[in-house]
Structures are given as structure tokens and as C-alpha cells.
């Protein structure tokens, strides 16, 4: 929300009109972040880790076959731990060891995200869990500049309005401060199957906002 102020002092040069304004641009995400985990349970921790590693290899192969370069694939966690089954009569019983490895994958071609998801699920099978897909704008430089232009235009229009209402004339800009509002983290979108059976990722829109505070001297 914008606000306006009129300030003065003994020195006429310090008299000014100050306003705040926010410019916002809506952008369609061009990239999707995929979070996935492979998990295998086996009789020994060695076998569990080997199984998870084999599943991870299938995941990487499927990603590469669908145009995902290695620098867009990052391991987030790697765990191996005993797994127990609890019953009231026997208490905790060791049933094996679970190994997991989680990944963050950047899919630069957002429109291809559903195809990538289908490919990794088919390649890895039941040892794969899809933890989430998050559409976002990979580079918001252009959108930020447009939001900045919008913010300045709104601020100037507001200051001009105050000047007209107060019967004064605007001089030069004497102060400007920008605060770039963090773009809200995109909500994780649910995956849906199309009529043809392929997974679709709904990209939605993302707001890119710039807020400014500006002062104009009173001529």
C-alpha cells in the first residue's frame, strides 16, 4: 500500500513530498524443481546402500536421457539406518536396513517436466518417491526491471497527485530507496494425469515485486 508525506523545515530546500509504491509483474514460471528420493530396504546396511545406489543410477540415466545435465542434479541427503517393526507382544524387532538418497533436480524446460517425471518413475520403479514439484522463474532479471518501472511510475503519479492537491510543484528526486520484496516461494503443484495418461505439471503464475520510497523536492 502506498503512502504519502509532506515535510518542511526552516530551509525551503528541504521541503519535499515523499511517497511509497510497489510495482508487481506476473510471470509464468519457466523452470520446475523436482524433489525425489530413492529408498531400498535390505537385510544388511551394505546391501541396502548398494540397492539405493543402483536405483540412483537408474534415476540419473533417465534424467540424462531426457535432457537434464549433471549440473542440474544435486544430492541432498544420503542415509542408511536400521528399520524396526514394533508389536505389543514382541516390542521392536529388526526387519532390515533402509538406505535412502534424495535429489533436487532442475528442469529448465518447464513444459517438459511431466515427461521427465514419467520417465524417472518408469526407470526406477517402486523404490522411487516423488517428494514434490515446484514451478518457478529461473532468471527474474527482466521481470524485476519491469516491476521497477511500474513502481517508479506509480510513485511519480502519486507524488504528482499530492502536489496538485496541495497546490505546489514537484522538483527533482532527492531520495530513493528500493526494497525488493522476496517473490513468494511457489506452491508445490500437484501432479495430474492427462487424458492420454501422461503427467502434467500446472505452472501457474509468480509475482515479482519491487517496493520503493521516493522523495521529490517542492519547487
PLM regions with names:
Residues 1-219:
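Short, charge-dense linear interaction motifs
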